[in-house]
Amino acid sequence: QALPPMGRASSISRTGGTDRMGEPVLVGDVGGTNVRFALAERRGGKVEISDFSKLSGDSFETFAAALRRYLQDTGLEPKHACFAMAGPVRDGEVMLTNRDWHVSARHLCEVFGFDDIKIINDFTAMARSVPEHSGDYFEEILPGKEIPELPVIVAGPGTGFGVASLFPLGDDAWQVLTGEGGHIAYAPRDALEFDIASVLMRTQGYVSNELVASGMGLEFVHRAFCEVFGRNLEDISPEEMRHRADEGDEMFDQLIAMRAKAVMGAVGDLALANGALGGVVLAGGVTERIVDYLRRPESVARFRERGPMSGYLANCPVRLMHDPEAPLIGAAAYYAQETLK
């Protein structure tokens, strides 16, 4: 039961289809920045989504308000839903990590009249989407040969830093385990990283991989670099930082390189700890913008160099998944699989 691009995967369709299987499911992807909704159905083995909408989280005081806007705008009256939320989920409830929203499945059922709602971690959905994608959605970062029966790590920085482990169960079924792996402590490995980490420890306290590599931590990392390099702090965008790095600005080049090495070191740690020789799949907007930095020799070394165990990850492939709607696909696949139990 290998993952794409080597093995089989259900294809994804966003229009049309026949052989309807099951009732439509409202799916949502709720991150620290945006809220995405769509209606999902599985037809003939394909997950199909329609009525897609992307809303800014800042425009709403609560998740329920965003959901109400979507339902009003589309006129849909779904009875089943699965929402992927960026935060730890317990007993059908979640407090978002990077937004002050508390969401309860029971409360939403009472307010909106759903028959059932499943709330899952956003990276549970991201991970569950991986086997639903064909090889066209994947870009190779590090070549290798996966061992199909072993776990896969799915991770990546966006606003935060999501992490999940994907286990093949056979018969096209998958188990996803999530925690808060992005909050594992950051491990500096060279002099500059120790200097930056020292500043972050003084200003932020606990220094996690999420703080170093994700969107929410970029401002703090930028401040630390300015202090270490003796530069004045400027209010500039991530795009401008990248532009300056491309133009030869050493500080911004080193800043992006440190974040890329943090990503590769983190997923290497996770693969090592989980025996995840099924491969690593990266996702998230930050990752897509630093692909060239992820391929640098020093980033590759962070993934593979493990002292006496350096050979362990030598053939473990790393791929980047390109699909902004992946969590919606994964939420639908998760709901369908759980409903069939």
Stretches with model-predicted labels:
Residues 116-147, 239-260, 265:
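ATP-dependent carbohydrate kinase catalytic cores
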Residues 35-39, 154-156, 161-167:
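Short beta-strand scaffold segments in enzyme catalytic cores
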Residues 19, 30, 143-149, 154-157, ...:
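Solvent-exposed alpha-helices and their adjacent loops that cap or buttress functional pockets
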Residues 72-119, 124, 128-137, 154, ...:
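Short beta-strand-loop/turn "lid" adjacent to the catalytic site in phosphate-handling enzymes
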Residues 134-138, 170-183:
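A short alpha->loop->secondary-structure connector
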Residues 6-7, 12-77, 170, 194-341:
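ATP-binding/phosphotransfer module of carbohydrate and carboxylate kinases, centering on a glycine-rich
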Residues 179-202:
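A short, charged helix-loop
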